[in-house]
A protein has these predicted regions:
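Radical SAM enzyme core and accessory elements
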Residues: 1-29, 47-51, 62-75, 79, ...
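N-terminal [4Fe-4S]-dependent radical SAM core
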Residues: 2-23, 155, 160-203, 548-550, ...
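Glycine-rich beta-alpha loop elements in corrinoid/cobalamin-binding modules
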Residues: 15, 25, 31-32, 38, ...
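Hydrophobic/aromatic residues located in beta-strands of well-ordered beta-sheets
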Residues: 26, 106, 155, 252, ...
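Residue-level recognition of beta-strand->loop/alpha-helix junctions
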Residues: 30, 55-59, 218, 355-357, ...
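Flexible glycine/acidic-rich beta-alpha junction loops that bind and position SAM and/or redox cofactors
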Residues: 117, 209, 213, 262-264, ...
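Catalytic cores of alpha/beta
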Residues: 117-123, 301, 361-376
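Radical SAM [4Fe-4S] cluster-binding motif and immediate context
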Residues: 179-351, 359, 372
């Protein structure tokens, strides 16, 4: 987007790392996109135990980070690594810090280090220890041992190298009472969507499902203890109110792996959460987003959630063909996914979704069938078309299966696999390069997705905006047109490639179309914002310090 109007530059604006005054005994380094609640909880728990701790954004760069660490001389430097794709970046940083003279104990945590500690320690010799699984208690004990000059290698929940061999202690049990943890530390200014401050919150940890491509359930099932733990609604709302008052947060992003709506217990929990949102005034003054499975999307429940502030639902649909759902072990049906989307449309709740156009079971025909499924759900322009390829993350069942089949390819940081029809390997590569301006990073689909999130944020937090319906119609028309172009490209190119013809893949033509579509989107958006600049600015600048204002009840 251009530089006019609220939050025009991008969907989220990253603020510089916030300094802490006291020398930090622990410095945690990682990405801070949309906040990093994992690091935030670690810092909060460390401080509760009398340990000075801080967070550092990894994108501050090696020189700035080294300078900061040399000034503060922390006892422990912790690296927060979720995806193995970033391992080279983390290792280069660790090497740079050692070369600069940083002598702190280097530890690392996250999904990949926890599940593949032997692989990581073998390929990342700068690391002294791995904190495995949930790290709050383990990190505190590690700091205590190092502070006292005692041997730390016997504490639960770590891995390390001794005498050239990788060793691991028994896994520490998961935190069973999430409400026993302090609210996570948030040293960064809230990111913004549509000009409104937004921050992540967490109502639960864990996932009851066993999707074959996902490392989340493996992460929680490998450690002892109850897999899914849910916070009390009272505590969740207390945290939201605190963020509303202190930071003016009006948009909350629930980062739960699977928002806890399953079964009767989940419905009762949701009812209490919504009741407390209404009683506190949050339902009238804030909106929130969740991620959940399609089977949880029930009309009555989600209508009530919408009234309590729900505005955006993310679902991992992943496939529109039975073979894909089966190999991904989604334990879902095509009809359930279609029904969920239809329900959200009827309730006028914005949605987004994950979708793997390519998976290990893919054929040229299934790719076209998946496009047909996508056309059913987003052919009307209700959301942009997005898709990806399933990747075999470390610690996932699908990675082990592909290895047994002899199809696993790639390397440590870029795992890959062969399709059963080897022609699909080349087709995927060419298609991915062709549609890069469309579906990658800040491509057209992401720009459209942000536009939908933004208009819904505007409409829900600033009712009565001039031209909102017309803008939505124009946005839907543009989205539908872009989706259909993408669908036809995949259908025509896959059929042609299957028959030995690559001519439909024209990256320059696609890039030119995406640029034209982005220009149209910017123009549409700018006209709408310009027509409503005063009411939008008034709402963005509302003083939230005294708490939400309750609307009068109509009897």
């Amino acid at each position: 987007m251009d530089s006019s109007g609220p939050d025009a530059a991008s969907a989220f604006v990253r603020e510089p790392t916030a300094p802490v005054r006291e020398p930090a005994e622990v410095a945690l380094i990682g990405f801070q996109d949309q906040g990093n609640l994992g690091m935030g909880y670690l810092v909060a728990v460390l401080r509760r135990h009398g340990c000075a701790a801080e967070m550092i954004e990894i994108r501050d760069g090696p020189e700035a980070i080294a300078k900061r660490l040399l000034e503060r001389q922390p006892l422990v430097v912790g690296f927060s690594l979720i995806f193995q794709f970033f391992l080279p970046q983390y290792r280069r940083l660790a090497q740079s810090l050692r070369a600069a003279g940083v002598t702190s104990h280097f530890t690392i945590g996250g999904h990949y280090p926890s599940l593949c500690h032997e692989e990581l320690l073998t390929n990342f010799p700068e690391i002294d220890s791995v904190v495995r699984y949930e790290g709050e208690e383990t990190l505190v004990e590690l700091v205590d041992r190092l502070r006292a000059g005692e041997d730390w290698r016997g504490i639960s929940g770590i891995a390390y190298v001794r005498d050239g061999a990788v060793a691991a202690t028994p896994a520490r049990p998961l935190v069973q009472d999430l409400d026993s943890l302090p609210f996570p530390d948030r040293p960064y200014k809230p990111e913004r969507v549509g000009g409104f401050p937004t921050l992540p919150v967490l109502a639960s940890r864990g996932c009851i499902r066993r999707c074959s491509f996902c490392s989340i359930h493996t992460f929680y099932r490998t450690a002892p203890g109850k897999v899914v733990r849910v916070r009390e609604p009272k505590k969740v709302v207390e945290e939201m109110l605190d963020l509303y008052r202190r930071h003016g947060v009006r948009v909350f992003l629930f980062q739960d792996d699977d928002f806890p709506l399953w079964g009767r217990k989940g419905r009762r929990w949701a009812d209490e959460l919504m009741g407390r949102m209404h009683d506190s005034g949050l339902a009238d003054n804030a909106i929130w987003k969740i991620s959940c499975r399609a089977e949880y999307v029930e009309p009555e429940l989600f209508a009530n959630m919408r009234e309590a502030g729900l505005f955006l639902v993310y679902m991992g649909i992943e496939s529109g063909v039975e073979s894909g759902l089966e190999i991904l072990f989604k334990q879902m049906t095509i009809e359930q996914n279609l029904d969920a989307i239809a329900t959200l449309k009827r309730l006028e709740i914005v949605y987004s979704y994950g979708f793997m156009l390519f998976d290990p079971s893919s054929t040229f025909e299934s790719v076209r069938q998946n496009v047909g499924f996508l056309r059913k759900i987003v052919g009307d322009g209700s959301a942009p078309a997005v898709f990806s390829r399933m990747l075999p993350y470390g610690g996932t069942p699908i990675r082990d299966q592909l290895a047994k089949e002899g199809r696993l390819r790639g390397d440590l940081t870029r795992p890959d696999y062969d399709f059963l029809d080897l022609r699909l390997n080349e087709y995927y590569r060419l298609l991915s390069d062709t549609v890069r301006p469309w579906i990658h990073n800040n491509g057209l689909s992401n720009q459209l997705s942000y536009a939908w999130d933004e208009i819904e944020t505007f409409a829900r937090l600033t009712p009565g905006l001039r031209g909102a319906k017309a803008y939505r119609r124009a946005l839907g028309k543009l989205t539908a047109e872009a989706n259909e172009r993408l669908f036809r490209l995949v259908e025509e190119s896959s059929l042609a490639f299957e028959n030995g013809d690559r001519s439909p893949l024209d990256p320059k033509r696609i890039a030119a179309y995406c640029e034209r579509a982005r220009t149209r989107l910017i123009d549409l958006r700018n006209v709408f914002v310009a027509d409503n600049l005063d009411p939008l600015t008034d709402q963005v600048n509302v003083d939230c310090s005294s708490g939400p204002v309750l609307r009068p009840q109509v009897h």
